[in-house]
């Protein structure tokens, strides 16, 4: 059995959403309750948002929390 690996795509989603909505790092951070520096680090994949932020981010980004993850390799049906 091959175990799948997961790649978090939250960085791309945040950056695209911010750009499409003409929001600054500071404005987007304010929507979630974090600093502009935190958002910048998320977008650059320096670090990831705490799991407690994922449901709120999903609502803001109009997606599900599952959309933040992509499965690579393995059999997703196993």
Predicted regions located by residue number:
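Key DNA-contacting residues within the recognition helix of helix-turn-helix
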Residues: 15, 40-41, 50, 69
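A short, Lys/Arg-rich alpha-helix, primarily the initiator
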Residues: 1-20
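Residue-level detection of the helix-turn-helix DNA-binding "recognition helix"
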Residues: 19, 33, 44-46, 73
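Short, charged recognition helix plus adjacent turn
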Residues: 4, 69-78
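DNA major-groove recognition helix of helix-turn-helix/homeodomain DNA-binding modules
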Residues: 52-67
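Short alpha-helical DNA-recognition segment
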Residues: 22-41
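Alpha-helical residues within the helix-turn-helix
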Residues: 19, 30, 59
């Amino acid at each position: 059995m091959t175990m799948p690996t997961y790649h978090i795509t939250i960085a791309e989603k945040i950056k695209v959403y911010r750009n499409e909505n003409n929001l600054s790092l500071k404005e987007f951070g304010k929507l979630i309750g974090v600093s502009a520096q935190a958002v910048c680090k998320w977008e650059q994949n320096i670090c990831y948002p705490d799991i407690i932020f994922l449901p709120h981010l999903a609502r803001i980004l109009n997606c599900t929390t599952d959309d933040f993850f992509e499965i690579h390799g393995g059999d997703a049906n196993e």
